Structures are given as structure tokens and as C-alpha cells.
Swiss-Prot record:
Family: Belongs to the ABC transporter superfamily. Beta-(1-->2)glucan exporter (TC 3.A.1.108.1) family.
Binding positions (ATP): 368-375
Domain notes: In NdvA the ATP-binding domain (NBD) and the transmembrane domain (TMD) are fused.
A molecular-function term among this protein's GO annotations: ATP hydrolysis activity
Gene name linked to the record: ndvA
Name assigned to this protein: Beta-(1-->2)glucan export ATP-binding/permease protein NdvA
Alphabetized CDD domains for the sequence: ABC_6TM_NdvA_beta-glucan_exporter_like
Protein's organism: Bartonella bacilliformis (strain ATCC 35685 / KC583 / Herrer 020/F12,63)
Catalytic activity annotation: [(1->2)-beta-D-glucosyl](n)(in) + ATP + H2O = [(1->2)-beta-D-glucosyl](n)(out) + ADP + phosphate + H(+)
Quaternary structure note: Homodimer.
Length: 595
């Protein structure tokens, strides 16, 4: 995207405040035209002083004009500031809403810190450009457009000096733009790396301290800053050179105007006041050209980060689901995978040709070694990803034909990572049901064995849990996540290692609660706990993304296959599979432990 197109697209965001924007633009144009009269009035003041005629009246008019111009500029600047800040926050809100609604794969490809950094830096740059446009850029272009014919009308020979000055500014700016384009893109790249390293280190500060990595992480940050400075220094050098060349050109131009003006005064072709007026025009043009140079500097330095932001924005629009998709009607919970395949981009991992059927109200245990595709399967059900081949149906309806919001209303998920916000306990649980009453909240926490420990906290349900629940133990975080799912009361329940962080006693209580809420609702469980697997209506064994075995717990034991070997590898002593001569469905265990 060219610099001009980037600039136009930035300004297009002001359409959301069109009336206020047009009013400020109109006022700015008027001010730009009126400003040109100031040097003319000042020239008249000089002539009246020289002629000793009506000096006070002319001087008073000039002073009133100048004061009015200042007041008008302050009012326009105040309106521009308010409009720019409103638009910045609006863009931030809308972009944030689109970003957090994007599929998980979108975030995995970009990284959280990259999306955050791009959003914040771009909105700051856009706000700066809006302010500069409404304060200076528009008035500068208008003033130059009006100034050129006015100066030529006064004295075309002196005007040529100003035109040469303008051409020099343009050539210098063009040269610097060409020299710094690639360098500015590199600067933005190193800015992202710097921000990513800081975010990564702080978010893992416990690991940094535990492994005494403070010196190493600081050294790595120092390397990032050196890379940034190495890329930024040549860019800054070019703009410093441009500033010096512009200043030299403007000084030479003023000297030329004064010398030529003095020559014409001696010849009697110009008055002293007219020369002063022309010097005022020269200074006005130099000021406007400096503003254009500053604008080009701002636009060039912002282009890389704005381009990244626009690419990110465009990707959110491209990935959004079609509008007006129907909602999922009353959900019973019958689920079927129809030859579902999903392969991660640039990877051989995924799930392949998965087919199975779950009746409404059944409990399904998904087991298999690490990386088998268990969580991917659940993510496909939640439409975190969409299958590349095949489809998934709920109650006979293809979930790709319904909107994601209604689908996710039918699902309550407890992740292995509890996923708590830096808010109060009440706020975190209430995510399950907006507007839930205290009675509903307390019932959910009691069922999840969380109510008692919450009451022991300093502010009970109004206790802040810290970033990602850092003020709570692992078991406490998990119980809050379970309470949140219980409160949602969705017809389909998904438990991703939901009891992995609980002690034995609490696990028994929570398991009883899960058994209770699993009644009459379809439940998917990713777990290695033997008790959960044994009670499942259907066990799915995955390996390398493929469904290797499926059936009830006892059916898979009798097969003496992968599932049976997984149990034995987990340290469980299991009787040999049942034979025709012996029908024994009891599996004695040496110890009751998780796989």
C-alpha cells in the first residue's frame, strides 16, 4: 500500500464522526485563508508608519486580527483533540471486539503480544495523524494553494524564489522517503520483537526467577534494543539531514527575498511595506513547508505499523462468518462426526477421517497419548477450527450452518487451564450466566465444592483472583472454572482434564457434582482418570490424529488393543481380557490412580 493510500485510509476512519469532522475542516480552511491576510496587514502597518498616516487604526486592526486568529485556532485545536481521542477509542473498541472474536488459529498464527502491540501502536499513530491533519495538514495545503497566486500577483520575480524553495523541499522529502522506507519497516519489526520479549518474560516471571534467568533475559532485551537502535539510527540520520537541508534552503530563500526586495525598493518598484509583506509570505510558506515535511516524517514512520494494522483488520473481516446465520434451536445433544479431517497449517498434525455418533445424554471419554488430537477434536466441536473435510452435526444440524454464538451457548467448557480473569471471584463465575442471582451463584459453587474456600477469602466473593488466577491455588482455580460451567447449565458439557489440579478428597466431591450435572446432558471428557473412563458410555481412543478404537470401557478392554495397553502402561494391573470361558467384567486394580 502506497503512502498516499495509507494516509487516505487513516482519514477514512473519521467518517464515524462525519459532521464534527466536516465542521472542523471548514473552520480550518477558513482560518488558512484568513491567515494569508496577516502579512498583508503587517505590510500596511509598516507603510503607514513610514508615511505617518493612520498608524494607530491600522495597528489596532492588525492586532485584533491576530488575537481573533489565535482564539479561533485554539477552538479548532480543542475540537480536533476531542474528535481524535473519541475516534481513537472507537477504533480501539471495534478492533478489540473483532480480534477477540477471531478463531483460535488466527491468534496462534499471530501471537497475543503481536496483535496487542499492533493495535495499540497503530491507534496511537492514527490519532496523531488525525490531530495533525485537522490542526495543520489541511490548512497547510489550502494556504499553499491560495498563497501561490497571491504572491505571483504581488511580484512574480520574488515568487520564483519561493517556488524554488518549495521544489527543494519536495525533492529532499522524496529522497529521504526512498532512503528510509525499508529501514522504517525494519524498525517496526524490531519494535515487535522488543515488545514480545518483554511480554514473554514478564508473563513467565516465576520461571525466570526460579531458574535464575534474570541476567540472561535482561541481556536478551539489551540485544533487542541494540537491534532496534541499529535499524533506527540510519532513519533518524536521514531525517536530521533533511531538516538541516530544509533549514539551509529556507535561510537562503529569505536572504534572496530581502536582497531582491531591497533592489526593487531602490528602483522604486516596491515599497518597504510590500517587501515586509513578501518576507511575511516567505516565512508563512517556510512554516507550511516545514509542516509538510513533518507530516511526511510522521506518515513514513507510521506506515509500517499502520500497514500491519490494516492487514490485521482485513483478516478479521475475511474470517468473520456470514451474517444472518440461523441459531441452533432447542438442543437435545445428539452429536455426530462425519468423516471429519482438520490439519493444522504448515504442519502434519491434526485429526483425520474421524467418524462417531453420540446419543443425547451420553458421556464420552476421549483418551490417547499426548498429541493424539484429543483437544483438537473438542475445538472442532466448539468451532474454534472448522473442518477442512467432513462436518459435525448437533441434532442432525451441520454446525457450520449456524452462528457460532448460538452454538457456544449450548456448550459449557472446563479447560485444563482454568482461564480466570483478573477480576473478582463473583465476576469470574458469573461469566457462565450474565445476571445470575446470588442464590444461583452459591448453588453452583457449592456443587463445585468451592463455596467453603471462597468464604475463607478476605472479601469472600468480591476477592480479586489476580492475573490468570495467580492469587488462588491450582485446585481453587479449577473449582471456580467448574462452578462457572455448572452455572451456565448448557445441554452439552466439555471437561478438558477438569479434575487434573484437584486433590483426591476434592476430586471425589467434584466428580460427584460432575456426575450429577452430567445427568440428561451430553458430556465429553478428556481425562486419564480411570474412574471417569470407566463410567463413560463411549470411549474414543485417538493416536496420531486418528480414531483407533471406540466402544465402551469393557469392550475396549476385551479387544486387548491400544486402550488396554495404555491402561497397563499407566501402572494399572488389569486382568486379561474376558474370554468365552470366563465372563468377568471386574477389573481389579493394584492402586487407584490416574493414568
Amino acid at each position: 500500500m502506497s503512502l498516499f493510500r495509507t494516509y487516505v485510509r487513516v482519514l477514512s476512519y473519521l467518517n464515524q464522526e462525519k459532521n464534527a469532522f466536516l465542521l472542523i475542516c471548514t473552520a480550518n480552511i477558513t482560518l488558512a485563508i484568513i491567515t494569508i491576510a496577516e502579512p498583508i496587514l503587517f505590510g500596511h502597518v509598516i507603510d503607514t508608519i513610514a508615511d505617518k498616516s493612520d498608524t494607530l487604526v491600522t495597528l489596532a486592526v492588525w492586532m485584533c486580527f491576530g488575537i481573533s486568529n489565535i482564539i479561533a485556532y485554539v477552538l479548532v485545536a480543542r475540537g480536533a483533540d476531542r474528535l481524535a481521542h473519541r475516534c481513537r477509542l472507537t477504533v480501539l473498541e471495534k478492533s478489540f471486539a473483532r480480534i477477540i472474536s477471531m478463531p483460535l488459529i488466527w491468534h496462534q498464527q499471530r501471537g497475543t503480544s503481536h496483535a496487542l502491540h499492533t493495535l495499540l501502536r497503530a491507534t496511537d499513530s492514527m490519532s496523531s495523524i488525525w490531530l495533525e491533519f485537522m490542526r495543520q495538514h489541511l490548512s497547510t495545503f489550502v494556504a499553499l494553494f491560495v498563497l501561490v497566486p497571491v504572491t505571483f500577483k504581488m511580484n512574480w520575480r520574488l515568487s520564483i524564489v519561493l517556488m524554488v524553495l518549495a521544489i527543494l523541499y519536495i525533492l529532499i522529502a522524496r529522497l529521504v522517503m526512498q532512503k528510509t522506507k525499508n529501514g522504517q519497516a525494519a524498525v517496526e519489526h524490531y519494535h515487535h520483537n522488543l515488545f514480545k520479549h518483554i511480554t514473554d518474560s514478564i508473563s513467565n516471571v516465576s520461571i525466570v526467577q526460579s531458574y535464575n534467568r534474570i541476567t540472561e533475559e535482561t541481556s536478551a532485551l539489551h540485544q533487542h534494543t541494540n537491534n532496534l537502535l541499529s535499524a533506527q539510527t540510519p532513519v533518524l540520520n536521514w531525517w536530521a539531514l533533511a531538516s538541516g537541508l530544509n533549514r539551509m534552503a529556507s535561510t537562503i530563500s529569505i536572504v534572496c527575498v530581502l536582497l531582491l526586495g531591497a533592489f526593487f525598493v531602490i528602483k522604486g518598484q516596491l515599497s518597504v511595506g510590500e517587501v515586509v509583506t513578501f518576507v511575511g509570505f516567505s516565512q508563512l510558506m517556510i512554516g507550511r513547508l516545514d509542516q509538510i515535511s513533518g507530516f511526511i516524517n510522521l506518515a513514513v514512520s507510521s506506515q509500517a505499523k499502520l500497514q500491519e494494522f490494516f492487514d490485521m483488520e482485513d483478516s478479521t473481516f475475511q474470517t468473520n462468518e456470514p451474517a444472518n446465520l440461523p441459531s441452533l434451536p432447542n438442543v437435545k445433544g445428539a452429536i455426530q462426526f462425519h468423516h471429519v479431517t482438520y490439519e493444522f497449517p504448515n504442519s502434519s498434525q491434526g485429526v483425520f477421517d474421524i467418524s462417531f455418533e453420540v446419543k443425547a445424554g451420553q458421556t464420552v471419554a476421549i483418551v490417547g497419548p499426548t498429541g493424539a488430537g484429543k483437544t483438537t477434536l473438542i475445538n472442532l466441536l466448539q468451532r474454534v477450527y472448522d473442518p477442512t473435510v467432513g462436518y459435525i452435526s448437533i441434532d442432525g444440524i451441520n454446525i457450520n450452518s449456524i452462528n457460532r454464538e448460538s452454538l457456544r451457548k449450548a456448550l459449557a467448557t472446563v479447560f485444563q487451564d482454568a482461564g480466570l480473569f483478573d477480576r473478582t471471584i463473583r465476576d469470574n463465575i458469573s461469566i457462565g450466566k450474565t445476571g445470575a442471582t446470588d442464590e444461583e451463584l452459591y448453588e453452583a459453587t457449592k456443587t463445585a465444592s468451592a463455596h467453603d474456600f471462597i468464604l475463607k477469602k478476605s472479601k469472600n466473593y468480591d476477592t480479586l483472583v489476580g492475573e490468570r488466577g495467580s492469587q488462588l491455588s491450582g485446585g481453587e482455580r479449577q473449582r471456580l472454572a467448574i462452578a462457572r460451567a455448572i452455572l451456565k447449565n448448557a445441554p452439552i458439557l466439555i471437561l478438558d482434564e477438569a479434575t487434573s489440579a484437584l486433590d483426591v478428597e476434592t476430586e471425589i466431591r467434584v466428580k460427584n457434582a460432575i456426575d450429577c450435572i452430567s445427568q440428561n446432558r451430553t458430556t465429553f471428557i478428556i481425562a486419564h482418570r480411570l474412574s471417569t473412563i470407566r463410567n463413560a458410555d463411549l470411549v474414543l481412543f485417538l493416536d496420531q490424529g486418528r480414531l483407533i478404537e471406540k466402544g465402551s470401557f469393557q469392550e475396549l478392554i476385551n479387544k486387548d488393543g491400544h486402550f488396554y495397553k495404555l491402561l497397563k502402561a499407566g501402572g494399572l494391573t488389569i486382568n486379561q481380557p474376558a474370554t468365552k470361558e470366563k465372563d468377568d467384567n471386574i477389573i481389579p486394580l493394584r492402586k487407584a490412580m490416574a493414568l
